[in-house]
């Protein structure tokens, strides 16, 4: 009987720890999303500036910069389309943790590619 009580207490403790971990992961995912979203406006602005240069002497490079910005923007839109906060409530704690870890990793990769695209576009000399 004592062993059964100990196992039950252990399971309750694990569940609470898993829930806390999933809440922390969800906060990280949503926080990173909130950091990346304003870059969408920046991407649109940079793309607009570069569009005016896309027929110049360096048009191939400019088109690559534009393509990179478009890819970053599309990746963010795709991620938002596939991510569902609502579905998290239907998952058990371990599934939720696994899902959120994957989403956080995807967003970190997205952040790297977006930062790279934005930096390249910002440093291109606009005349």
Q: Where does each model-flagged region fall?
A:
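Sec-dependent N-terminal signal peptides
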Residues: 3-12
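Bacterial signal peptide processing site
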Residues: 14-18
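Post-signal-peptide N-terminal segment of Sec-exported extracytoplasmic proteins
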Residues: 32-70, 74-77
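C-terminal amphipathic alpha-helix
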Residues: 29-32, 36, 93-127
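Charged/polar positions within long, soluble alpha-helices
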Residues: 41-48, 52, 74-88, 112-126
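PEST-like intrinsically disordered, low-complexity C-terminal regions enriched in Ser/Thr/Pro
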Residues: 19-28
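Long, amphipathic, charge-rich alpha-helical segments that form helical bundles/coiled-coils
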Residues: 62-107
């Amino acid at each position: 009987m004592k062993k059964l009580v100990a196992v039950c207490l252990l399971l309750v403790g694990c569940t609470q720890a898993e829930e806390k971990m999933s809440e922390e992961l969800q906060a990280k995912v949503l926080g990173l999303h909130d950091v990346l979203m304003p870059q969408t406006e920046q991407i649109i602005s940079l793309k607009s500036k570069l569009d005016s240069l896309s027929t110049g002497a360096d048009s191939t490079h400019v088109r690559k910069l534009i393509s990179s910005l478009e890819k970053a923007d599309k990746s963010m839109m795709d991620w938002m389309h596939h991510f569902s906060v609502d579905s998290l409530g239907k998952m058990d704690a371990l599934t939720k943790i696994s899902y959120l870890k994957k989403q956080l990793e995807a967003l970190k990769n997205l952040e790297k590619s977006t930062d790279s695209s934005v930096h390249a576009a910002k440093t291109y000399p606009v005349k």
